[in-house]
Structure formats: C-alpha cells, structure tokens
C-alpha cells in the first residue's frame, strides 16, 4: 500500500530542486545542429561555422577541429599556423615547407596552361563573337584562336585548385569561364556547385542566389532518372542555401517558397528534418514583413504548422515546439516557456543569431494576437508574463500593439486591464463563429 501513497509536497519540492532549469549554455549545447549540418557541407563551408564556435566552445578543441578540417586543402600557410598553435611551436615541420613549394609550383603551372584562354576571354572583341551555343563557341575559338579542349578543361582544374587554396573570388571567375565553354555536363554541374560555394564564401549573395537556381535546374534535369541522386543533391542544396537565407533579404521569400515546394519539403521530411528549425524561424520572422503579402504569409504559417505536426516524432527543438504550443496545443504558458528557450538556441546558431531579435519580436506579436482573439478582458500583468516582459514593458508593448494593428481596444490603467471591443453577436452569429473556429482548428491541424 505504501508504494501507492502520493508523494508529499516536500518530496515534490526536493525533486524540483534536484532538476533546476537548464542554463542558456546547456540549452544551446543540447540543440546544437553542427554535427547534423557538417555531412551536407563542403569543408570550406564548414569553416565559418567553426569560426562562430570559437567564442562558445573550448578554443583548443576548435583550433584542432579547424586543423583536421583544412589539413588536406592547399591553404598551406594557414594550416601551418594552426599546427604551430596546436603544438605551441614557433617552427613547422619540413613537410609543410615542401607542400607550400609544391602548391606554388602547381599554381604557376596552371597559370601557364590557362593563360592563353583566359586572355582571350578577357578580350571584348572575342567575347562579342560568342553565342549561347557552346559547340559553336568552341569551334569558333578553335578555328580562329587555336583553343583546344584541354585548354578549356584547364580552366576547371585551375578553378578547383584556386578554391582549394582559399582564393574563392578567382575560383568563381575561372569556373564561370569554364562553364561558358564546356559541354561536359558532369564537369559543368561540378563547376556550378564550386561557383555557388565561392559566391557564398565571398558573401556575394546575389551571385549565390543565381547559382542556387542553376544548381536546382541541374538537379531536376541531369538527375531526372535518379531519384536517390536527386534526394541527396537536394539535401546538399538545402543546407548550402542556409547561407544566403538569413544574410540576404531578397533570398528569404525565394528560399521559403523553395523549401515548401513538394520536392523540397519531402526532402526535408525524409532526409533532414532539422531544417524545420530554419524554416520555422524564417516563417515566424516573416511576420514582420507580412504587410507585403498577408495571404502568402498565412499560407506559409499554415504549411509550417502542418509540417511541424507531422514531424513532431522525428524532430523537435524550442523553435518548432513554440509553433506546436501556440498553434497546435493552444498552450500559451508553454509557448512563452519555449520562446525563452528558442531565444537561447537562436543566439547560439550560426545561421540564426542575426535573426534572434526579430524572431522574439514576431513571436510575441503572434502570442498576443492569438491571446487577444480569444479573450474579452486581458490582465496586462498576465499577458506581460506570457510575453516574458515585466509589467511596465508589457504595458508599452500592448500600447504599441494596439496602435500598430489598429485593433478596437482600450486600456484601463486603473484596473491594469485591456478591454477588447469584440463586436456583439447574435446567438445565431455566435453559433456560426464557434463553428468557424472549430473548422479553423481542424484546418490548422490537417
């Protein structure tokens, strides 16, 4: 019988004390996606993520990780300096000196091999005679200027080598020149991925978005009869697209639409459900931009809710849990709790740190909008708590909300309440509205 006695208050309190709330650092570590992201990124694209970790993790471990990441590249001077830092030495082994000499010799050789064709492609008179037909272009250059297929391929090899050396701007130009002339579909596809990476690493976001579109088209056409290849390549493109997603405002709508398209949302659900974090963050922060197209935003939100509900058993974090609490469970207390955790996750995520403030702002708006829709009289202190604000901050927030959204409401400062002037309804209208509300919740949950 004793085993069935409910626990005392003291036992419950001591249990709570044994499990104190997690710190921001613990939450960030628990939901760190770096191990999930790395397999889908080129090693050069991983480097900025490790740089971001330098201020958060053990610096020695990060330095060692950078060394392991880049030791097989041709960034010889940088790798040598990492080795010196790891080994606390002022000198480097002879193997680094030898590799540096080999890299310089290869650079000189590639430059000589490609000098003729690069000079021709910088000549306006020559470029003016080029057309969209690659075969005709190559024939023209061969007949008029003695260009060979080996010379064209040297642009590809030289571009890849420059990329391996960390000269991303030069690599982008060489790979572009190669792509203009080559009819080798596999190499052209590889060059397009290389140019996308180069544009990302030089933060040329407009150019990166052009390459995202080219890679997407290549996946659809070149891998048309290879569903597994399409799945893998789409997974890579989704991860690479995260760089412009949150760094270039014009990319936001384009990539949100891409991620929600049938082929790509299926890829996310099948292969990389953790991308829901970034999709959710994009949709929530898009609330601040909703004036551009409110109906489009509502569709994004509805699509997000549907996917979060479907994938709840496969993946969740405080960002997706916030969506679940607010729009699936209609639990305002849980939504406020998850918003606090989400902020910690956002500030520790390389891609989302710059969107953290916008996310919190938009999320508070969404909580308050939902809360105001279902309450006639709102206690300012209670709503402030749900928004993670003190009473003074909450009061200012609500004043701004009423002003910005033009809702019909007034604040009773004496009582500390907001009175929502929902229009009076007939019994018939109340039945209709309740039916519509039930229908809305049903639609959201589908």
From Swiss-Prot:
Xref: InterPro entries: eIF3e (IPR016650), eIF3e_N (IPR019010), PCI_dom (IPR000717), WH_DNA-bd_sf (IPR036390)
Main location: cytoplasm
Entry GO terms, CC: eukaryotic 43S preinitiation complex; eukaryotic 48S preinitiation complex; eukaryotic translation initiation factor 3 complex, eIF3e
One MF term in the entry's GO annotations: translation initiation factor activity
Location in or out of the cell: Cytoplasm
UniProt entry keywords in alphabetical sequence: Cytoplasm, Initiation factor, Protein biosynthesis
Domain PCI positions: 256-425
Gene Ontology biological process: formation of cytoplasmic translation initiation complex
Gene3D superfamilies the record matches: 1.25.40.570
PANTHER family: EUKARYOTIC TRANSLATION INITIATION FACTOR 3 SUBUNIT E
Subunit structure: Component of the eukaryotic translation initiation factor 3 (eIF-3) complex.
Function according to Swiss-Prot or TrEMBL: Component of the eukaryotic translation initiation factor 3 (eIF-3) complex, which is involved in protein synthesis of a specialized repertoire of mRNAs and, together with other initiation factors, stimulates binding of mRNA and methionyl-tRNAi to the 40S ribosome. The eIF-3 complex specifically targets and initiates translation of a subset of mRNAs involved in cell proliferation.
HAMAP family: eIF3e (MF_03004)
Family affiliation: Belongs to the eIF-3 subunit E family.
Protein name (record): Eukaryotic translation initiation factor 3 subunit E
